[in-house]
Amino acid sequence: MTGFFTILSFSLAALSVTNAAQILSVPKGAEVVPNGYIVVMKDDTSQQDFSSHRVWISSIHHNMTRRGLDGAGVKQTYDFDHLRGYSGIFDEDTIKDISNDPKVAFVEPDAIISQHVVVQQRKAPWGLSRLSNRRGGRNYVFDSSAGSGVWAYVVDSGVDVRHSEFQGRAVWGSNLVDNKNSDGTGHGTHVAGTIAGKTYGIAKNAKVVAVKVLNSEGKGPTSGIIAGINWSIRHARKHGMLQKSVLNMSLGGTYSAGLNHATAQAIKAGMFVSVSAGNDNINSNGNSPASERSVCTIAASTENDGKASFSNWGPAVDLYAPGHNILSARPGGGSQTMSGTSMAAPHAAGVAAYLIAKEGIPGNRACLRLKQLSQPTIRNPGPDTTSRLLYNGSGR
């Protein structure tokens, strides 16, 4: 697997030439894949033009290898309905040539994305009861449909699909980061348990599809996240499930135009997408995919309906959801408690799956429905931030 490193000062603006595609920069200190780039084509690029461009890229692969750039060339190809592009390892001369192609919209460094979990401790769950009661309570109130016929794509660190919480409803989908079809951090299994676990889950009858994009350190390249989204869309389309699917990404990193564009493609295709706002107590506008306006960006609330101290905020946030001391599944059996906006986002994904099954709404309309049902109960949500808390519409 390609190694990661942290750059102290990085700007590619100097590579740009007149009439060339923009080569975006990343903030100081951002962790990136060495010589890794994401290339996005212009919207009007035809399939034939894209194929011709890829043939040209293949022709210069040999030259890069001769210049001593190990593992050079295209690693992932993206072919969304309204976005075409690819990622790979390229030297500066090659990136300059790529940016000069009039079919290229922009190029950006392949930054590292991380999961949004902050602490683990043992405490009782409370999130399920809170999202089904306007004023709080001890019981989780829900319709027995419970997400039946809905698929939940967990784009994360993997899922222990054999965990008893999933009752055989979890399957392995794709691995875009390593060769280990397991959950090395427990993060993805916890997230999946909140969405669809029999005990800790909201949509207790939904199917879970594991899409691994984060390694055992909870990190992965942006290019792999985009590939995971691309795979999920294709898989849901193949099975006729686009409008009956939710996609959760409890992860994030520095702003990425490519990742935001790719995330938007899932909504355009018909899916519901929930993402975590981030855990730095800052405006989430600078993070991706949280800053993508078409997704459902979720901040974390506490047991007393306050903003969790770590939670990001800002106008990109669509809703608050329980994200502090959340009990859910652990790989190998059993359970564990975690906190973070990573725990808040799957609450939204679970309620979206629940409503898709119960009300028959298409996935890409579910975020609007969540906001319609939500309650304005969060105290001190942050500047220019909604105070609305997730609610499943149970009537309680």
Curated annotation (Swiss-Prot):
Native organism: Arthroderma benhamiae (strain ATCC MYA-4681 / CBS 112371) (Trichophyton mentagrophytes)
Peptidase S8 domain segment(s): 125-396
Propeptide regions on this chain: 21-116
Gene that encodes the chain: SUB5
Biased segments, Polar residues type: 376-389
Annotated EC: 3.4.21.-
SUPFAM superfamilies, per the entry: Protease propeptides/inhibitors (SSF54897), Subtilisin-like (SSF52743)
Record function comment: Secreted subtilisin-like serine protease with keratinolytic activity that contributes to pathogenicity.
Protein name from the UniProt record: Subtilisin-like protease 5
Active site positions: D156 (charge relay system), H187 (charge relay system), S342 (charge relay system)
GO BP term, pick one: proteolysis
Family listed: Belongs to the peptidase S8 family.
